[in-house]
């Protein structure tokens, strides 16, 4: 983020002997770490209400992660705030706070906010992290997300994912149904609509830089256009008129190419497009439906689903279409694969048909499993769960979840997030029905 200037705060103490073990968020569910996010000290020139809002956003980020359990401020004993003093650690231990966040906010002559924080280990009485951020006042929420990112990274060892965006398809709950591309913060805040609802829109995707999105729009029932929209300028342009396309492209890690599925002559195949020349290269052959391609983080492989053997299964191939290998072998239909940014897992939707109808599942599998490993793990199920996508640190999956009419009357579609362990499932609040989420990388 150009407007944010970072000043790394010099650490006051050595980190040696850190009492809290680094939390491994991949293996099962551990008890959340109690953390106290103290009221930030606000100077006379800064907005007191805004200061409280910063604390609320930090606390909410940490709570939503499932890694931390923020302690209610009503139980705080020490009344001092700010970063100019050493805390009374015994007072924080008395309320079982293993971690403490102190901070302050000042308004500079330039009009920017100077937001500082320190993360303390109350058991060893050591400072763990600290930073100062200078931000335009309207970007205070992003500053709060970045502070939460720093805390999360220090305790888990994984990069944070709070300063990110979600693009998705919003659908009105009243008739006539109107679908629009919408953009929001990862936690549902700052929702805004990017299209006017005059045409059917599908599958928004972020470009690698996260300052552009691509989506499919049906100007007519038979004509599908892929649009590119610049999120900074609002300008929009047509990337291509691809008859038979059903999903927006997914982009290579270097941002130079994209893959998509296009239906022609009774078959649907995977194509790669060079974004500079707009030239298409067909990657799959034979009969059948091949859809939902997704690049590996290094761009060398592509995962997709194909019904070439009768039932949709997952396959991996080299990015040039060679060396095709099937990777799913369970019962049911596998669709919508999404490769983790870490490269270790592939998320997917699995549909199992039984006597009582279909059951939808979101699962993960090792991208390169060993022979003795379980190939997949289901992490959530429901009437309709689909369209999984990954947080930029590869530790959280966001997906669309639907209910039939009567269960959450009338039928609804909403966006949920869940840890890759299958724990901490939570709804991301949106103004209207929501589907087809796509998670950006961490913002600059």
UniProtKB/Swiss-Prot annotation:
NCBIfam families with a match to the protein in the record: propeller_TolB (TIGR02800)
Chief place where the protein resides: periplasm
Function recorded in the entry: Part of the Tol-Pal system, which plays a role in outer membrane invagination during cell division and is important for maintaining outer membrane integrity.
Encoding gene (name): tolB
SUPFAM superfamilies referenced in this protein's UniProt entry, alphabetically: TolB, N-terminal domain, Tricorn protease N-terminal domain
Annotated protein name in UniProt: Tol-Pal system protein TolB
Signal peptide: 1-19
Species annotation: Rickettsia akari (strain Hartford)
S-S bridge residues: none
């Amino acid at each position: 983020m150009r407007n944010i200037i970072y000043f790394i705060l010099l650490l006051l103490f050595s980190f040696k002997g850190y009492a809290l073990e680094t939390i491994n968020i991949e293996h099962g569910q551990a008890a959340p770490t109690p953390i106290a996010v103290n009221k930030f000290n606000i100077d006379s020139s800064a907005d007191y209400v805004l200061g409280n809002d910063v604390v609320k956003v930090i606390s909410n980020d940490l709570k939503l992660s499932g890694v931390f359990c923020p302690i209610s401020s009503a139980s705080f004993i020490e009344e001092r705030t700010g970063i100019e003093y050493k805390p009374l650690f015994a007072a924080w231990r008395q309320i079982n706070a293993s971690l403490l966040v102190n901070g302050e906010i000042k308004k500079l002559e330039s009009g920017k906010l100077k937001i500082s924080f320190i993360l303390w280990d109350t058991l060893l009485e050591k400072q763990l992290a600290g930073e100062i951020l200078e931000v335009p006042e309207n970007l205070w929420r992003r500053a709060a997300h970045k502070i939460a990112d720093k805390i999360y990274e220090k305790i888990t060892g994984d990069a944070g994912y709070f300063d990110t965006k979600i693009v998705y398809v919003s659908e009105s709950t009243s008739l006539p149904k109107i679908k629009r591309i919408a953009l929001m913060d990862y936690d549902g805040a700052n929702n805004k609509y990017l299209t006017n609802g005059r045409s059917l829109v599908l599958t928004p995707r972020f470009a690698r830089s996260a300052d552009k999105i691509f989506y499919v729009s049906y100007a007519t029932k038979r004509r599908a256009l892929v649009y590119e929209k610049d999120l900074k300028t609002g300008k929009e342009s047509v990337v291509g008129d691809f008859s038979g396309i059903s999903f927006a492209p997914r982009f290579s890690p270097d941002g130079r190419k994209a893959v998509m599925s296009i239906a022609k002559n009774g078959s649907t195949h995977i194509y790669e497009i060079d974004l500079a020349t707009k030239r298409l290269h067909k990657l799959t052959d034979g009969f059948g439906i091949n859809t939902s391609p997704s690049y590996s983080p290094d761009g060398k492989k592509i995962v997709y689903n194909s019904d070439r053997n009768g039932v949709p299964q997952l396959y991996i191939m080299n990015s040039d279409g060679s060396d095709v290998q099937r990777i799913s072998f369970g019962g049911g239909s596998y669709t919508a694969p999404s490769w983790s940014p870490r490269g270790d897992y592939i998320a997917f939707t699995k549909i199992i048909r039984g006597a009582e109808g279909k059951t939808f599942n979101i699962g993960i599998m090792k991208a390169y499993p060993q022979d003795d490993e379980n190939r997949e793990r289901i992490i959530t199920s429901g009437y309709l769960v689909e369209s999984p996508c990954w947080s930029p640190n590869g530790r959280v999956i966001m997906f669309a979840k639907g209910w039939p009419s009567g269960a959450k009357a009338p039928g609804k579609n909403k966006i949920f997030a869940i840890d890759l362990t299958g724990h901490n499932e939570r709804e991301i609040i949106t103004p209207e029905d929501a589907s087809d989420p796509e998670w950006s990388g961490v913002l600059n």
